[in-house]
From Swiss-Prot:
Ribonucleoprotein listed as a keyword: yes
GO molecular function, one term: structural constituent of ribosome
Name listed for the protein in its UniProt record: Large ribosomal subunit protein bL35
Gene Ontology cellular component terms for the protein in this record: cytosolic large ribosomal subunit
GO terms (BP aspect): translation
NCBIfam families: rpmI_bact
Family: Belongs to the bacterial ribosomal protein bL35 family.
Length: 64
């Protein structure tokens, strides 16, 4: 049986932390910043963790 391939799009978007969690970037960061407050834009710079409901599915997508 051939090796499973990782999902290349998911591999570029998610990174595993040292504790095993998955880190992701935030949405709403590409354009339309004039409508957003400075506080909102600052919060969007921070990375976030993948929710527990999505963790298992994404983990299988990026498994190597």
């Amino acid at each position: 049986m051939p090796k499973m391939k990782s999902h290349r799009g998911a591999s570029k978007r998610f990174k595993r932390t040292a504790s095993g969690k998955l880190k992701r970037g935030r949405a709403y960061t590409s354009h339309l910043f004039g409508n957003k407050s400075t506080k909102a834009k600052r919060k969007l710079r921070k990375a976030s963790m993948v929710s527990s409901g999505d963790f298992k599915r994404i983990r299988h997508m990026i498994a190597k």
